[in-house]
Amino acid sequence: MSIPQSKSSSNGFPLKRGETEEVLHKTNTSNTVFNGEAGSLKRLSLDRLVYFTTCKIGHHVEVHLRNGSVYTGIFHAANVEKDFGIILKMACLIKDGTLRGHKSRSEFVRKPPSKTFIIPADELVQVIAKDLSVSSNNMSNAVQGEKPSELLTDSSISQSYHVDRERQLQRWVPDETIPHGADLENVFDNPWNRKWNQFEVNKSLFGVKSTFDEDLYTTRLERGPQTKQLEEHAQKIAREIEAETTRDIHVAEERGLQLNENFDFDEEARYSSVRPVTGFGDSGFDLEDNALLDTCNDLTFGGSSTSDGQKPASSGKGCEELRVSGDSQSSRKNKNVDQSCSTSKQQSKDFPAAGSNISESQLDEQRRKNNEEVSHNNRSAEESTSGHGDIKEGAKSGGGASSVSKAVTEREREASQVSSKTKSESSFGQSASRSSESRPGPSTSSRPGLSPSSSIGSMASSEKSTLNPNAKEFKLNPKAKSFKPLQSAAAPPQSPIADASFYYPGPSHVPVQQMPGMPPVNYGLPPYPGNQPQMMYHPQAYYHPNGQPQYPQQQMIPGQQQQQMIPGQQHPRPVYYMHPPPYPQDMPYHNKGRE
C-alpha cells in the first residue's frame, strides 16, 4: 500500500512519542477545517488513512526508504496530523541502499535490531503489511484465536477454529501396496523399496552431493573375526531388554506387547505424546505394580517377598527348615572349635618341653599318634552332627545318656592334660596353644534344638579357656588424664670404636663439633626420611691397635725434661707428662689406655 508524500515539518518530528500514540487513535482532528465539497472529500480520505494505519499497529511491516534501503519491524506509531512519520519497534536493516555492491541479507541479520527506530516523512516511500485484516469479523476471530486454552491435545491442535471441535481422529489404514508389519526400522530394508536411495535422489533431482558419514553419528563397527560374536551378544541383550515388562504405553506399542484388558484407553492415549487429564485411568495396573514391587524386593533383599494376605500354607515347615539350618550352622561352628582345640593340642605335643631329650624317631611316632587322634575326633564330630534323627534316636535309647556323660568326662580329662602340659612347653608352643584356646566359642544356649555335640564342644572350649572368671570388666574413665612418662636422664653415649691401648675418649661434657670446612647437613636439599650417617669431628685422634705405635697429644712440663734410653735405639726418647682426661664412671674402658 503506497502512502502519498506530505510536506515535512520545519522542526523534523515535532510531537513526542506519547502525543503521537494519542493522535493516532483520534478519528477527528480539531485543527482541520473543511469548507464545502472539497473539504468533505479530504476529510474522508484522511479518515480512511488513519483507519488503515491503526490496523497496522502491532503487525510486522516492511518499510522502503527513498535511498533504496529496506527495514523490517513491528509497526508501533505514526504522525497523521502534519506529516506521516512512523516509528518501528525491533527494526532490522535487510537492504542498504547506500552501498553500491550487492550485500547478502544474512550479513544484515547478524546485526542486533534497534528497539526504537524513527523514520521521518521526507525519507519514507511506502509501508508494506502482508495478511492484514481490515474487517471487524476477521479481527474478532483473530482475537478469539489468540486466547490460549488450558490444555492442548493433539486433537485440539489439529482442529481448526472454523469447524466443529468434536471431530474425532481417524484411524490410519495402510494401503495395499504397503506390506503388513512395516515400520520405520525396516522400511528401507524391504525388497519392494530397496532401490530407493535418498542421496542419489537428491543428487539427480537437485544436484546436491551429500557428504553424509554415519560414523559421525554412530559407533564405528570394527570388522574382524569377532564381529559375528559381538553381533550375537548385542542381539541377545536387545532381546532381553525387549522381553522385560514395561508400564509405558508407547514402549509397549513399539515392542508389540499386549496391555491389560482392564486398561481403558483410546487411540489418542496410545499414540499421542500428550497425556490428557481426564479419561486416563491405571486401575488395571494394580496387580502389575505389586508384581513389579515384589520383583524389586527379591532382587534387593533376596528370597521371596509375599504380602501378609498371601502367606503360604507351609509356614510351619519353613520355620522348621530355618531351625534345622540354624542347628547345622551351630554344629559346624562347634566342629571348627573342636578342630582348633585339637590342632592346638597337636602343636603343643609336637614341641617338647625344654630340657627333655627325645630322639627324632620318638618325636615322629608321637606326631603320628596325634594325627590319628585328630582324625578320629573329626569323624566322631561328623557322626554326631550328621542329622537330627540320629540325635533323637540316641536320646531315646538307654545308652545315649551314658555315652554323652562319657564323652564329657573324656573331654574334661583331655583338657586337664593339655593345661598341665602347656606349663612346660616352649615359647612357640605356648603362643600357638594359647592363641587357639583363647578363641571364644559361639554361644548356642539361646538357640532352640541344639545338638548334644555342640553343647559338649562349647563346654569343653569354656573349660579350656585360661581367662580369669573373677576378673572385672574394664571401664574407660572419661575424666582420666593422659599419662605422660617422665623423661629419664640420658644415658652416657657408648663409643662405637673398638677398645685399644692408645685410644683416649674425649670428656663427656665437651660438645661435639662440626667438621671444619664442611657445609651443614641437608643444606639446600629436602630432608632424607631414612637414617643418615652423622659426620662428626672429635679433637682426639683414633689410633689403630695393630698399627705403628703412636703417642697421644702430649704437653711439655716447663723446666722438666727427662731422657729414657730404649734398647736398640741410638737416640733417647723424651718423656713428657700428660694430663689424664676426666673419664666418666660408667665407661668400662677407662684406665685401659694407660696400661
Swiss-Prot record:
SMART domains for the chain: LsmAD
Annotated spans, Disordered: 302-505, 536-595
Keyword Repeat attributed: yes
Tissue-specific expression: Expressed in cauline leaves, stems, rosette leaves, immature siliques and primary inflorescences.
Biased composition (Polar residues): 302-313, 326-346
Motif (PAM2-like 2): 475-485
MF terms (GO), sorted A to Z: mRNA binding
Compositional bias annotation for Basic and acidic residues: 364-382
Domain Sm stretches: 48-113
Biased composition (Low complexity): 416-465, 488-501, 548-570
Motif PAM2-like 1, residue numbers: 466-474
This protein's UniProt keywords: Repeat
Domain comment (free text): Contains a tandem repeat of a PAM2-like motif, which seems to be involved in the binding to the PABC/CTC domain of PAB proteins.
Protein name: Polyadenylate-binding protein-interacting protein 4
Organism: Arabidopsis thaliana (Mouse-ear cress)
Taxonomic placement: Eukaryota, Viridiplantae, Streptophyta, Embryophyta, Tracheophyta
